[in-house]
Every structure is written in structure tokens, then in C-alpha cells.
């Protein structure tokens, strides 16, 4: 039996921990060393009182047969131990429970793990421990009389601090016994040890460039501010002042811009008819909002004294997929350069010389493009870089069993196969690849790139424009060859798209052509389309039959006690604790990515999706989710992050949540944390900051068909039984709409009507007109919310439809408030005189009465936001009140470290969660399998970015990009038939090839 030594350090440093462990360690001191041998009592060595290490601790650390167990020991404790005490524990003797937890889809925080495994943990003590760490492990505030708290200045707190250190050992020891070890096999353990070597090695950084770039940005911002003032006659002080700039452009040039998005500005700049002064002003605005100063600042504060940046990747940091997550510098989210490599190289030299303005017109663009160039090769070495080619596309075809495509990849790699783009067209049109013309190949290229992740017409349109494909010529060339049946289906979809205003401005001919090509591409990939549904079926079977493995092509799914495991071909598993089926939905326990609470989640199997047409905020502006491409940058509410693009998840049942169609289990960020879309009616969306220069798009107001009897009730605003009627008495009236439930309720006293409407209804305007001229009345608003009038006025206003309206109060969760939109509002459309919905009364002195007075709004600009709100304590929040329906649904893959992105809703920007991807996990295993051989061959890995390896190697011909690519694309025994290819280059400064 393995002997264990459980260890934990408490440290002090005047360098903040957010600068990274290695920078923190340069000034670190060890305060306490807590330890326990196997199940022996915990001991605490107070290093501040006695510098001599206890004899038993020294013996344990010197014994090579004893395994030391730490929580975050790899990335923190052992680094400090080596730096401060010069004790270099071999990584083979280090076990990290944090990494073990992450590898199995569990949170890394020790406190959360205690909650999950029901380990006895005193919450009050844990809270006190954090306060003690803040007091004793960090410098005191500058205005404090005591600059550092110690055992001498805070003796009582110090003793409690020692007790707290011992309690962490007890918790860690219990957690170690509970954690599964499926994913900590020999290969994964060796891979983690290599990961620690890479993190400790770090990468050489051009600190001079980072400092020069920050200086250049600061100077350029001042210059742009001066230019803005000159161009606007001091009406606008800085081009980053969006509202002031929009107002000035409208007044000075008579041009109203819908927003300040980069795509909007670029279109205007390219317009030859705009005045030169406006063109210059818009260019200044673009430059002012393009920079990456935060990355440069993170680099400078975290780089070690020797010029290397360390500790930038967390092993298994990406939940469940096992991919690495960025830390400190976040190298996975470096902006894609917009300048060519030669321009960047010259610009870097100019930045370092302090004269970038002499060769570059846009300093901000240069500094953003030069950010990757901060990673350099040290003297005598070069950077050798290689990237797996289209690994996720290959992996998807291989996992799904799309054999014809797997063979096509393999033959193409061997130089024997047909061009993949010709093959894509030929496969769709049932032609021979050699018969595909140059023009048809271009169509095939757009099909492969635009539809590879399930994109539709909009994706096809985006890639067609990107590759200069003339859509009229496309329609002329392709339409005659499209089978009639496919064409008929495309025509039906076009007619539906016209009704929903989602034709993207395309003519019928072009739309039908693009949609037909989409259908033909999907018909050519039947295994890929069915793959996700087969996985879901296997998961449901496994949950219902514990201990039995269910095969799903190259995957297997099984339930071991409370754990659901999707076993990848590599032998690693994607782990889902406490998986079960609830109302047909697959659920499991997981960490809420926002609140960090452990709770039941409903995201699995491609079901968490958004309806086609949902607008996603990308760095180029708002874009329908189906056309978001691989390597695009999306806003996650905090920063721009890279995504692997959208994935089509079939036709699924969607509901309306916050005015957007999505599956009921899709995760949305509310004021109370992450909730499923089906719960959205009970919560307001979380506030979300949009990046400077980006504005919520305008939503077209449509008529609202309520599809059921409308109940119109009135109530008065008072706080007692006795109502004193005075001239100041105000009455509020709400339009109430029952939510579709199955409750059997009494017949309401409201007449059924066939879509009567309030016409010309506008908020903040005193008049509105009924469908009946003789009943036109004036209505007044109660402040910014509600309708101020009496029941009789509403009866008169509604003419013959309002005679049976009672005047009592109702409150029920099944009813919905309806804030009146600025255009037409249909009151109802029913098919029968009976109703499913009941009413109930509430006394005027109800303590809950005032909670529902008026119609509250989180946004004063009522004319821009038509909402259906739930009436929970009077708060406004668009709900899932609309009936369910079937729609094409999509999700985004791998959206940065927070796994989320921002979409547009009528209520404002909304943060949603992105889907997990089995292909990512399997692709990660390909990269991981080949990392140890690459390291052994002399290519010292300094960084991995998605499917790319950056290594340092001697500057000799022996080490080449071809050699590295060959090692990276080597097939493992578990993926011997997976076609792999890698390409790379050699450089002295990192760049995007």
C-alpha cells in the first residue's frame, strides 16, 4: 500500500497572486507547513517561529517511496517549496487532488468538493479562514498603521490561522479517498507531469516590445483625442464617446448611423459619397476602439525576472473535455492579426524604436496584430510550430462513421485523392470529381467551409461573400442540376423564411439555391447528422441500466453507480456525476459556471441550443448564430474570446425565453445565476456590459397573437381597505394574459374576440385609438409604467368587447403582464368559447398588492423594448410564454475559458452557455498522445493553443517544422485509422501562419 504525506502551505508575498504563481514566488515566504502522514494526526510547522524543519517532516520528504498529496500542489505549493526552501520534489512523487477533480468534471475548489462528497466542513470556519488569509498572507492597505500582520501583532488571529491550516489537511485527506481515478491512468499522469514541466519552463517574452506597445497606445490615444476634438470643433472630446459622436455626426453631416459597430463604420468608410471629414472621423473612431492593452499589461505584471512567462495553462481546465485552459496571459484568446507578417515585423521594430507612426497609419491595429509577436525564441534557439489540420472535422467524420469522408481525407493527405472541395461538390451533385469545373469547385469550397458545422443559408452566404462567389452566377450554375425534390423542400423553407423575415435579403432564386445546396450537403453526410441523436439514445439507455456499456460507434456509454461516463477511444472518459432522466431530459450535477454553485444542470447531447437567426455579438458585429464561423471572436460579457464556430443540432422543440427561441434546457445567465431557459420566467436576466462601440440591435415589432382569451382586469393602488377618493388617487390597469397551462379553472368573464387591436398605441404619447372610431378616448400614463384609467374607461375604449370586464384584482403565477408595444397589439384569437384558465380574487388589503402595481421596467426606453413579463414581484422579464414549436437550432463550440457568449434579446444583451463537444475531447487526446514523443525528440514545448504546439528547439537543420509535424500527426493505437495531417513553420517570433 502506498504511503501518503498530505501537505499544505500557507504563504505571504507582497506580489498579488493574480500575477501568477511564479511571479508571486519571487518574493514569497512560507508561514506555515501543515502535514499529516497517512491517517496520523495533523501537524503544523510554524516556519516563522522555528526555521528548522521538524525531523519527521524532513524524513517524509526525503523518502522516495512516499507520495506527497497536495491540493493545487503542482501549480502552487511545489513551486513555492522549491523557490523558498530549495526542495525540488520529483513530479513522480506529487499527486494533485485539484487536477484529479478537474479530470473528472468536478470543481477544483476544496470547499465545493467537501460539499459534493458530504465531507464534514465547518462553513463558518472556512469563511473565517479566508479572512485570516486576507489578514496574514497579504500586505495591509497603504493607509493602515501596520503594514503587515504577523504573530507578534495579531497573536490570537495567528493561533486560529494555524488551526485553519490543519483543517485543510483533514478535508484534503477525506477528498482524496472519495475522488474517482478513471482519468488518472498512467498516460494521463505522465501527461500531467509533462504539463508541469512546460508550465515551469515558460516561454520567452519580448518585454521591450510590450512596454513599447503600451507607450505607443497611450500616445496614440492622446493624438486621436486631439484629432477628434479638431474634427468636431470640440463637440466630442474623445472618439470613444459613442453617444456624443453619434449625435455630432447626425447634426453636422445629416447622417444617422444605426450603431458604432466596426462593420457599420467600415461600410461607411468605404462609401465614396460620404464627406472626407466624416470618413476621417469614422476612421479615428475605429482606431480608438481597437487595442489589446489588457494583454500587454497582464504580460508585464506576470513575467518573471528572467523574461519568461510561466504558469499560463491549467491541465484539464476546460470542464469535462479535458482541454487546457488559459491562465494569467490567456494565450488561447490572442486576437487574430489583421496585418500581414511582413508589416507586423516592420511595425514591431518601429514600435521598439519609438517611431511606429512613421510607417503605420493605425497604431492600434498594429499593437493588436503584434501581440503574438511578444512570444519569442531565446538566443541560440528558434520556435518550431505545428498545427493539426482540421482535426475536429476529421475527428467528427471518424467518430460518426462518415467513412467516405474519412477515406477522402486519407487519400488527399497521401497525395492520391481528389481535391476535397471538388469532392464536396461532386458528392452533393452525384458527379465524378474529375468532372467538377473550377467554378463548381469554388461552390464546393463554400459548402465544405460554410456547412461543415451545420450552417445553413446564412452561413453559405457569409462564406460565399468571403470567397468572392457571385450568388447570381452560383444560382445560374447550380440550380439546373439540383434534384426537383430538394428544390421543392427548399422552396417550402423559403416561404416560411419570408413569413419570419429571415431571407437575409436574398432573392427567391438565390435563397432556394443556397438552401438546396445545404440540404444536399447534409444528405451526403447522413452519419454525421444522426451521430448526436445516437449518443443521446445511448446515454438514456446507460442511465436506465447501470453497469452495462452501450456502444455508440467508436464511443461507449455506461453508468457506474451515480456516475455517467462517455468513454472516448483513447480510454479517457467524459464524466457526469449523478446523471438521471427527468421528464425526458438528461440531467447531471455540475458547477454553475457563474455562481460556482454545485447544482443540477440540463446541458447534454447537443440539446442546449438556440433557434436559427439568434443574434450573437461577434467582434465584427451582431451575427446570426448559424453563420458564426470557426476562429471567430465572440463577446462573453467580459472580453472577446475565440470560438470554434456554430454547430447544427437538428430540428428541436424550442420555447421563448427573454424573447429568443431556445431549447428549454439551454443555460442563460440570470440575476440569480445560471438557470435553464424553462426557468427564465422567474428571473430577470443578468446585467451585461457591451464592449465600447457596440449597441443592441433594433428588434422589429410584430403583432402578438395571444392564441387565447385575453382577460383585462383593473385594480387600484392603495394600502388599506378604506380607499379615499381624491383628485390625486391613481388607478393602474394591466393587460393580463394567461400562460398556457393545463389547470382546469372557471370560465372567465371576458368575451372571445377575433384579433381586435389597439392601433397606433405608443408609450409616452397621450392618445391611442381603438378599432372603433366612436369609442376613441384619451388615456394617461402612470409615470413611465402602467395605464392610468378606470375600468369604465376601458369598457368604453373596448366598445362592445369590454362589457363583461369585472373590476376586481387577480394575482396568479400562471398569468402574465403585457407591456404594451409601440405598434399594434392584438388582444386575442380563440377558437372556442371555453377557457382553460381561471381567475381568483385577492382582497384590497393584501400585503402583496403593491408588489404588482403598474408595470415595472428595467429599461426606461420603453418604446424600444416590448416585453412579456412574469409579474414576479412586479419585475419585468420576458418569459417563455409563447407556445413551443419546432425549429432549426444551433450552438457555439468552445467559447473561451468561461464557456459562454452574448446574444441579443428585445430586453437587452443576454449571456448564454455554449455546448460541450465530444469531438474537442477526442481531438485533445490526439494532441496529448503525441506530446511526450515530441518532447523526447528535443522539441521543448513552451505552449499549446487549441490544436497547435509551439516549441523551442536548437537553431539547427536537425529540428524542423516537417519533423515536428510528422511527430504531431502520428497515429496512436486507438486511432490507427484516423487520417491525421499537420503543417507548421519555423520562426524567431510567434505569429499566425
Swiss-Prot record:
InterPro entries the record matches: DNA-dir_DNA_pol_A_palm_dom, DNA/RNA_pol_sf, DNA_polymerase_A, Hint_dom_sf, Intein_C, Intein_N, RNaseH-like_sf
UniProt-recorded name of the protein: Probable DNA polymerase
UniProt record, GO biological process: DNA-templated DNA replication; double-strand break repair; intein-mediated protein splicing; viral DNA genome replication
Signal sequence bounds: none
Keywords assigned by UniProt, alphabetized: DNA replication, DNA-directed DNA polymerase, Hydrolase, Nucleotidyltransferase, Transferase, Viral DNA replication
Repeat as UniProt keyword: no
Pfam family, one: DNA_pol_A
EC number: 2.7.7.7, 3.1.11.-
Gene (name only): 45
Catalytic reactions of this protein: DNA(n) + a 2'-deoxyribonucleoside 5'-triphosphate = DNA(n+1) + diphosphate
Function field: Replicates viral genomic DNA. This polymerase possesses two enzymatic activities: DNA synthesis (polymerase) and an exonucleolytic activity that degrades single-stranded DNA in the 3'-5' direction.
GO MF terms held by the record: DNA binding; DNA-directed DNA polymerase activity; hydrolase activity
Similarity comment: Belongs to the DNA polymerase type-A family.
Amino acid at each position: 500500500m502506498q504511503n501518503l504525506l498530505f501537505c499544505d502551505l500557507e504563504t505571504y508575498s507582497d506580489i498579488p497572486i493574480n500575477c501568477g504563481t511564479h511571479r508571486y514566488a519571487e518574493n514569497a515566504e512560507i508561514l506555515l507547513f501543515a502535514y499529516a502522514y497517512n491517517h496520523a494526526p495533523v501537524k503544523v510547522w510554524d516556519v516563522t517561529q522555528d526555521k528548522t524543519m521538524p525531523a519527521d517532516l524532513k524524513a517524509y520528504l526525503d523518502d522516495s517511496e512516499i507520495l506527497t498529496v497536495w491540493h493545487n500542489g503542482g501549480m502552487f505549493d511545489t513551486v513555492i517549496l522549491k523557490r523558498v526552501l530549495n526542495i525540488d520534489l520529483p513530479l513522480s512523487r506529487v499527486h494533485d487532488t485539484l487536477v484529479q477533480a478537474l479530470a473528472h468534471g468536478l470543481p477544483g475548489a476544496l470547499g465545493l468538493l467537501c460539499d459534493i462528497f458530504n465531507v464534514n466542513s465547518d462553513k463558518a470556519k472556512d469563511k473565517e479562514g479566508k479572512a485570516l488569509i486576507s489578514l496574514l498572507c497579504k500586505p495591509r492597505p497603504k493607509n493602515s498603521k501596520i503594514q503587515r500582520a504577523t504573530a507578534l501583532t495579531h497573536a490570537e488571529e495567528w493561533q486560529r490561522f494555524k488551526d485553519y491550516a490543519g483543517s485543510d489537511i483533514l478535508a484534503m485527506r477525506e477528498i482524496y479517498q472519495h475522488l474517482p481515478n478513471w482519468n488518472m491512468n498512467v498516460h494521463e499522469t505522465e501527461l500531467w507531469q509533462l504539463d508541469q514541466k512546460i508550465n515551469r519552463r515558460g516561454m520567452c517574452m519580448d518585454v521591450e516590445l510590450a512596454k513599447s506597445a503600451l507607450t505607443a497606445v497611450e500616445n496614440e490615444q492622446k493624438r486621436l483625442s486631439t484629432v477628434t476634438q479638431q474634427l468636431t470643433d470640440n463637440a466630442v472630446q474623445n472618439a470613444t464617446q459613442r453617444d456624443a459622436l453619434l449625435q455630432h455626426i447626425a447634426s453636422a453631416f445629416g447622417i444617422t448611423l444605426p450603431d458604432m459597430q466596426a462593420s457599420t463604420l467600415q461600410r461607411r468608410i468605404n462609401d465614396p459619397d460620404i464627406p472626407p471629414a466624416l470618413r476621417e472621423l469614422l476612421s479615428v473612431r475605429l482606431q480608438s476602439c481597437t487595442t489589446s492593452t489588457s494583454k500587454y499589461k497582464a504580460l508585464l505584471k506576470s513575467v518573471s525576472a528572467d523574461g519568461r512567462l510561466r504558469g499560463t495553462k491549467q491541465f484539464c481546465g476546460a470542464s469535462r473535455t479535458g482541454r487546457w485552459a488559459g491562465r494569467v496571459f490567456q494565450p488561447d484568446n490572442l486576437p487574430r492579426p489583421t496585418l500581414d507578417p511582413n508589416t507586423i515585423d516592420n511595425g514591431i521594430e518601429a514600435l521598439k524604436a519609438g517611431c511606429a507612426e512613421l510607417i503605420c497609419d493605425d497604431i492600434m491595429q498594429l499593437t493588436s496584430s503584434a501581440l503574438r509577436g511578444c512570444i519569442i525564441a531565446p538566443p541560440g534557439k528558434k520556435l518550431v510550430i505545428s498545427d493539426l489540420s482540421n482535426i475536429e472535422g476529421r475527428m467528427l467524420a471518424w467518430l460518426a462513421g462518415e467513412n467516405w469522408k474519412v477515406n477522402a481525407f486519407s487519400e488527399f493527405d497521401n497525395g492520391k485523392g481528389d481535391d476535397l472541395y471538388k469532392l464536396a461538390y461532386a458528392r452533393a451533385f452525384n458527379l465524378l470529381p474529375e468532372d467538377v469545373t473550377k467554378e463548381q469547385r469554388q461552390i464546393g469550397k463554400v459548402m465544405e467551409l460554410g456547412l461543415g458545422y451545420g450552417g445553413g443559408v446564412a452561413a453559405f452566404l457569409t462564406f460565399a461573400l468571403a470567397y468572392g462567389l457571385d450568388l447570381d452566377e452560383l444560382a445560374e450554375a447550380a440550380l439546373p442540376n439540383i434534384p426537383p425534390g430538394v428544390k421543392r423542400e427548399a422552396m417550402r423553407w423559403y416561404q416560411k423564411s419570408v413569413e419570419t423575415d429571415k431571407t437575409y435579403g436574398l432573392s427567391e432564386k438565390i435563397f432556394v439555391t443556397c438552401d438546396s445546396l445545404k440540404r444536399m450537403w447534409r444528405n451526403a453526410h447522413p452519419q454525421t447528422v444522426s451521430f448526436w441523436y445516437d449518443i443521446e439514445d445511448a446515454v438514456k439507455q446507460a442511465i436506465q441500466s447501470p453497469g452495462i456499456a452501450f456502444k455508440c460507434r467508436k464511443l461507449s456509454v455506461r453508468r457506474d453507480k451515480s456516475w455517467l461516463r462517455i468513454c472516448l477511444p483513447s480510454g479517457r472518459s467524459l464524466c457526469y456525476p449523478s446523471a438521471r432522466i427527468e421528464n425526458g431530459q438528461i440531467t447531471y450535477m455540475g458547477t454553475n459556471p457563474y455562481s460556482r454553485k454545485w447544482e443540477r444542470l440540463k446541458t447534454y447531447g447537443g440539446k442546449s441550443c438556440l433557434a436559427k437567426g439568434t443574434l450573437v455579438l461577434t467582434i465584427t458585429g451582431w451575427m446570426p448564430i448559424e453563420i458564426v464561423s470557426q476562429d471567430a471572436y465572440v463577446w462573453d460579457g467580459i472580453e472577446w474570446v475565440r470560438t470554434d464556430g456554430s454547430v447544427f443540432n437538428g430540428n428541436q422543440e424550442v420555447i421563448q425565453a427573454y424573447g429568443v427561441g431556445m431549447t428549454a434546457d439551454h443555460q442563460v445567465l440570470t440575476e440569480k445565476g445560471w438557470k435553464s431557459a424553462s426557468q427564465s420566467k422567474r428571473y430577470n436576466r443578468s446585467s451585461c456590459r457591451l464592449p465600447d462601440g457596440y449597441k443592441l440591435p433594433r428588434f422589429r415589432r410584430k403583432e402578438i397573437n395571444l392564441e387565447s382569451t385575453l382577460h383585462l382586469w383593473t385594480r387600484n393602488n392603495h394600502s388599506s381597505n378604506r380607499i379615499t377618493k381624491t383628485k390625486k388617487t391613481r388607478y393602474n390597469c394591466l393587460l393580463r394574459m394567461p400562460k398556457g397551462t393545463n389547470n382546469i379553472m372557471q370560465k372567465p368573464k371576458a368575451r372571445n374576440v377575433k384579433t381586435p387591436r389597439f392601433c397606433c398605441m405608443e408609450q409616452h404619447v397621450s392618445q391611442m385609438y381603438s378599432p372603433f372610431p366612436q369609442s376613441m378616448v384619451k388615456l394617461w400614463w402612470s409615470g413611465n409604467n402602467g395605464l392610468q384609467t378606470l375600468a369604465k374607461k376601458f369598457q368604453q375604449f373596448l366598445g362592445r368587447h369590454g362589457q363583461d370586464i369585472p373590476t376586481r384584482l387577480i394575482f396568479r403565477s400562471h398569468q402574465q403582464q403585457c407591456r404594451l408595444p409601440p405598434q399594434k397589439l392584438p388582444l386575442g384569437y380563440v377558437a372556442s368559447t371555453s377557457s382553460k384558465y381561471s381567475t381568483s380574487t385577492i382582497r384590497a388589503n393584501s400585503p402583496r398588492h403593491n408588489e404588482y402595481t403598474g408595470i415595472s421596467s428595467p429599461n426606461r426606453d420603453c418604446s424600444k423594448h416590448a416585453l412579456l413579463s412574469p409579474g414576479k414581484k412586479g419585475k419585468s422579464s420576458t418569459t417563455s410564454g409563447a407556445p413551443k414549436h419546432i425549429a432549426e437550432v444551433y450552438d457555439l463550440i468552445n467559447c473561451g475559458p468561461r464557456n459562454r457568449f452574448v446574444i441579443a434579446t428585445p430586453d437587452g444583451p443576454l449571456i448564454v452557455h455554449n455546448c460541450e463537444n465530444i469531438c474537442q475531447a477526442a481531438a485533445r487526446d490526439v494532441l496529448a498522445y503525441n506530446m511526450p514523443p515530441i518532447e523526447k525528440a528535443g522539441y521543448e514545448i513552451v505552449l499549446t493553443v487549441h490544436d497547435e504546439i509551439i516549441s523551442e528547439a536548437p537553431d539547427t537543420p536537425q529540428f524542423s517544422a516537417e519533423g515536428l509535424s510528422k511527430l504531431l500527426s502520428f497515429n496512436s493505437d486507438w486511432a490507427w485509422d484516423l487520417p491525421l495531417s499537420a503543417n507548421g513553420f519555423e520562426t524567431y517570433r510567434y505569429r499566425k501562419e
